């Protein structure tokens, strides 16, 4: 599988706009200079459990299979303690995927593959650099008020918009890897925390949301 096979048009359009932002190259250079990736890896090793052939070998086997199918370099895989079901991928040069313990407890084996496949999709589509910059800007904004003062506001806003669109491409990747039925089952659990066998109802709800999202009132309130 190649990135061009799964990248959503909205994702491609948004990332093209980001690359045209004045000052982006300087922001990237600043990011790389301060070595935020090393900080992330240190926090992972100190506060999470790394998944490998000895720790959670079945999960690691499934993870390796997905990585091979996509033909990407194997990132590090970690589990962190949180009851909330979540996963994320950061690190351009030292890439890692982190899964919450809530995911491990609530999703079955195939559904976990769907989540991991989604995160691997971000890697395949080369989203990780920009996602890492986004989270770094968010942390810097809270610490130093940079975002609130407007220093990086144009870049931050564009990255936020693109980040939402990038999820469409990652979802495509997950769906291709595990199939639509498993993918939809995982989404239902992520949304409600409960198992749902009513796939048709989920699809109808998704269509209803899409119609609502396109409404002029909704667009005037929030852009997604």
Question: What name fits each language-model region?
Answer:
Residues 120-139, 145:
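Catalytic Zn2+-binding segment of zinc metalloproteases
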Residues 93-95, 140:
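Short, hinge-like loop/turn segments at secondary-structure boundaries
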Residues 141-200:
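Metalloprotease/metallohydrolase-associated module, dominated by Zn2+-dependent proteases
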Residues 23, 80-89, 93, 177-224:
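Active-site-proximal gating segments in proteases and membrane effectors
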Residues 1-93, 156, 224:
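Hydrophobic or amphipathic, alpha-helical segments that drive membrane association/targeting
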Residues 80-85, 103, 138-140:
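Short glycine-enriched loops at secondary-structure junctions
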Residues 50-54, 99-114, 158-164:
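Short pre-active-site segment immediately N-terminal to the catalytic Zn-binding motif
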Residues 107, 116-125, 169, 173:
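Active-site His/Glu-centered metal-binding helix of metallohydrolases
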């Amino acid at each position: 599988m190649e990135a061009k096979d799964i990248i959503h048009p909205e994702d491609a359009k948004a990332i093209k706009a980001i690359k045209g932002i004045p000052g982006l190259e300087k922001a990237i250079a600043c990011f790389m200079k301060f070595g935020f990736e090393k900080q992330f890896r240190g926090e992972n090793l100190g506060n999470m459990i790394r998944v490998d052939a000895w720790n959670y070998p079945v999960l690691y086997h499934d993870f390796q299979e997905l990585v091979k199918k996509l033909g990407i370099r194997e990132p590090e895989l970690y589990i962190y303690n949180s009851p909330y079901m979540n996963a994320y991928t950061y690190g351009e040069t030292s890439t890692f995927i982190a899964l919450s313990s809530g995911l491990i407890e609530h999703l079955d084996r195939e559904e976990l593959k769907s989540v991991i496949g989604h995160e691997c999709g971000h890697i395949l589509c080369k989203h990780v650099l920009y996602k890492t910059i986004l989270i770094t800007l968010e942390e810097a904004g809270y610490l130093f008020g940079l975002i609130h003062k407007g220093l990086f506001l144009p870049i931050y806003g564009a990255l936020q918009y693109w980040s939402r669109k990038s999820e469409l491409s990652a979802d495509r990747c997950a769906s291709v890897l595990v199939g639509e039925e498993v993918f939809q089952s995982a989404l239902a659990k992520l949304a409600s925390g409960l198992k749902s066998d009513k796939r048709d109802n989920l699809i109808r709800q998704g269509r209803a949301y899409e119609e609502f999202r396109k409404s002029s009132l909704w667009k005037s309130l929030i852009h997604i």
